Amino acid sequence: MSSRGGGVGGRRGGPGGASSVRGGERGRKRGRGALDAVEPRVPLPRGTGSGPGAGRDGAAAPVPALQPAEADVLSGEVETEMAAGMEAREGASSSSSASAPAVGEVEPPSRAVGALPPTSSKAVVLQARPGFGTVGTSCRVRANHFVVQLADKEIYHYDVAIAPELRSRERNRNIINELLRSHKKYLDGRRSPAYDGRKGMFTAGALPFTDREFVVKIANDPERGNQGEKEFKVTIKCAGAANLYMHSLKQFLAGTYPSQDRFSHKHLDIRILIVALNGGEDISATTFYKAQPVIDFALDYLNMNIRDAYSRFDQDGTRVSVVQYFNRQYSYSLKYINWPCLQAGSDSRPTYLPMEVCRIVKGQRYSRKLNECQVTRMLRLARETPEERENSILEIANENNYGNDYHAREFGIGVTNQLALVDARVLPAPMLKYHDSGQEKVCNPSIGQWNMNNKRMLNGGSINYWACLTFASCVRLAEVRTFCKELVRVCNSIGMQITGEPCVRIRQERQDHLDAAVRDIHRQSAEFLSQQGVIGQQLELLVIVLPDANATVFYGRIKRLCETELGVITQCCLARNVQNVGGRNTVLEDALHRRIPLLTDMPTMIFGADVTHPPAGEDSSPSIAAVVASMDWPEVSKYKCSVSSQSHREEIIADLFTEVKDSQNRLVYGGMIRELIESFRKANGSYKPGRIIFYRDGVSEGQFSQVLLSEMDAIRKACASIEEGYLPPVTFVVVQKRHHTRLFPEDHHARDQMDRSRNILPGTVVDTKICHPSEFDFYLCSHSGIQGTSHPTHYYVLFDENNFSADALQTLTYHLCYTYARCTRSVSIVPPVYYAHLAASRARHYLEEGSLPDHGSSSASAAGGSRRNDRGVPVKPLPEIKENVKQFMFYC
């Protein structure tokens, strides 16, 4: 079997040069032709273009489509798999020894002949690793992973069926444990199988049968009123021969296994094994309800108005009160007979319980949104320095004592009790360019931080018409005027241009007049501009001072009203957050001089995408999708957004590409990708992007293939709909923050290995040992810690047609983290993804006036369209954002 090639779209060879078609002639001989085994889709059009969007020889670099490969025969069945890659053009070399480009090199995207995309996410093969990074200062860090030693043993897999079937894993395990005890002579008593509580069992060596049925009797639970025994039939069947060898697994983890993508078994995905064999420990904190009597809870938190204990109901045809019922049934005299009862049943069959007989049991997680005070307390309690966290993890690992687990001994698995020592590198920080009129024109950040002293914005925005409105009764109007003057002074001092006086007088209004006051000040400003003879202009910025109490509710109402109805950008925060006026704080020095490989050589568009979901407990609210994209090339610091609503908890972005028929029955193309590419073209002299880099947040590992298949298809269709043959090469990167990997300095006393918070240095990147041995992923800690333990971000490249080397992509991603508009610090995730999350959170406010802020992540096109969720209920579309607002980073 040949090595893996160029990811989903594939190309001949990929970075390593080997053909990426799996199976080759072997597949043609062993099974039916793979091209017959899959129903092909209509291929996307290919063609040529010109200008900066074109390839090196003047033709547009076409996107290689997704190609089916030959069928593999596994366990006697023919399984159709799609592999990355495709047959090379006629006359092309079948192998190449060219190495991956270094940071300063650019390798042109490979060509491909039209191919067919796969129709199943199971067919997708992820991008192969192009090599390991070398840029930066070498160092070592400790990861909260524990090295696992494997013995050379054969592992056998058995299918288990229990009848009658049970849902409880614990009950299933009890049945298997009883089977092992009572049928020891049939099971080879030396074996200690590992059972997953469902249908899978593994043994270190073969059992003395391939298929056998057993009868197991289990005593019923007397505490539940069940006496006697219950009989179960257990069938154990060999799922295959010795289908997993420890030495093969070790080869895979070392990156030397002949087929890097998976072992030859249809159910065992190697990803599961990597998680199991790269054991990690971490500490998580969450909130729980306090275990206490319900009466105490009601006194502390609730103002309940429910049924009291004197309420009557029918018992055997007799009307009795709750007090009488408990006295007769349980000989229990209620003490608090005037307290209300709890309704513990359903609406159709209510069950009323007195509060005093109920307790809130321990261990119930509180899943709703915490208020600001609770969040502060939670962070304070959960905060641990890196050294404290490392010690806590080691303490837990020693308590668990994995090395002495009987299953570990049975399978020859040894687990170290020390954190894994991992090779890492600290990438150099980028040089930041400021305006030449400032004393400091170029800034070299120190440990991920810098300030605005003696610097001016490179391209500060201008505001000619602004106003201010306050709803904070505790702040005097004179104080608000002083604040506005200081705001104008500070903004002008750092390179912005703001007129000194508002276009209408500063006003103080009552909170219950919010909508009317905002509409009125918008009307007054329009009248002022008309009187001044200003044509085509309107209020550019409305500064709003909010009260401390209920500020969140007011914030949502203001944003919905101003951004979707009035078309006014508002600033409800302090001067340090005034970013929404169309300028740029800073850009990368190398971007201006076009020294960033695979970014500045041709017009490049960087996308960020996220989907956020409603909070727990809401079963009908739509999810929100958001996509942002860079509009300024080569600086890539200004991002336009598109947002849309979609089905409840649907992770795949639905509106990336749309096609509908108009009244004339003609196809009309739309969607978020097309909208943003058209905006890019207008902002860059009619040039289309010749390269796309797509950072996607919120995707779990189990969704990689499905999201990639669907969203890459949408990106290609959107590009092809703009111009025939327009298919720029795409790099698709998943950004993961919700994982449990933590990195610690090797020596907690070496100051040169840490930042001020005693965390690892910003720019620390790891792409070995704790990463996938053959797929393209890396951990990057791009920020300087403030408190607690820093959380590195996991970047996983699912698809790369731009031939990024490890160094090139890692450096680009790290440098982008210095361009976040809200602060003079590098941030922990790449800014396009950060912006997408902010845009999605903002769009959540648009769903309902006065709604509370978002609890998850969101995405894109304001039109949204009318669709139905999985329950057949129409998804409520988002109101459209006014076009003059969308031109700015209003969400930031």
Swiss-Prot record:
Asked if Oxidoreductase is a keyword of the record, the answer is no
GO molecular function terms here? RNA binding; RNA endonuclease activity
Q: Which GO terms describe its cellular component?
A: cytoplasm; nucleus
Highest taxon of source: Eukaryota
Keyword list, A-Z: RNA-mediated gene silencing
Domain Piwi, residue spans = 541-848
List all Basic and acidic residues biased stretches: 867-876
Which stretches does UniProt call biased (Low complexity)?
Answer: 86-107, 856-866
**Pfam families in alphabetical order:** ArgoL2, ArgoMid, ArgoN, PAZ, Piwi
Ranges where the PAZ domain occurs: 248-362
Q: Which InterPro entries match?
A: ArgoL2, Argonaute_Mid_dom, Argonaute_N, PAZ_dom, PAZ_dom_sf, Piwi, Piwi_ago-like, RNaseH-like_sf
User: What's an example Gene Ontology biological process for this entry?
Assistant: regulatory ncRNA-mediated gene silencing
Q: Where is this region: Disordered?
A: 1-68, 86-117, 850-876
Gene3D superfamilies reported for this sequence: 3.40.50.2300, paz domain (2.170.260.10), Ribonuclease H-like superfamily/Ribonuclease H (3.30.420.10)
Q: Where does the record place Gly residues bias?
A: 1-17
For this UniProt entry, which residues form the secretion signal?
A: none
Q: Which SMART domains match?
A: Piwi
Family, according to the entry, reads as follows: Belongs to the argonaute family. Ago subfamily.
Question: Which PANTHER family does its entry note?
Answer: EUKARYOTIC TRANSLATION INITIATION FACTOR 2C
Summarizing the function annotation, the protein's role is: Probably involved in the RNA silencing pathway. May bind to short RNAs such as microRNAs (miRNAs) or short interfering RNAs (siRNAs), and represses the translation of mRNAs which are complementary to them.
List the protein's name: Protein argonaute 11
Q: Which organism is it from?
A: Oryza sativa subsp. japonica (Rice)
